[in-house]
């Protein structure tokens, strides 16, 4: 990952010391590297057990939604069991390790 070109974005909700929800995204900048940036999601993993559109990583396991040009194009499954508390860190490590391949395969295309 290169500063200004790609990043990992993590958001989570915690109550009583437990993770209620999270979203971890690998994002790529299609704007300026040192000016106005335009971040696009490349891959996303989330845990929203109380949402109609979400899912529970403890019941369903982690999966990655893979995007290209703002459209979901694939889903990667087959991850090991992980608790909601450990899943955000697991996703960050996975994205750090796999960023090059994921960005090359699913990142926004140059015009």
Regions inferred by a protein language model and the residue ranges of each:
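Negatively charged, low-complexity tracts enriched in Asp/Glu with abundant Ser/Thr
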Residues: 1-41
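Acidic, low-complexity intrinsically disordered segments
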Residues: 59-110
């Amino acid at each position: 990952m290169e500063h200004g070109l790609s990043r990992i974005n993590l958001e989570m909700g915690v109550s009583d010391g437990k993770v209620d929800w999270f979203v971890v995204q690998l994002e790529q900048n299609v704007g300026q590297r040192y000016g106005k940036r335009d971040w696009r999601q490349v891959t996303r993993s989330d845990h929203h057990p109380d949402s109609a559109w979400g899912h529970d990583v403890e019941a369903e396991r982690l999966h990655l939604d893979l995007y290209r040009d703002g459209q979901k194009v694939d889903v990667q499954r087959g991850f090991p069991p992980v608790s909601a508390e450990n899943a955000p860190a697991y996703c960050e490590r996975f994205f750090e390790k796999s960023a090059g391949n994921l960005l090359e395969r699913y990142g926004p295309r140059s015009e």
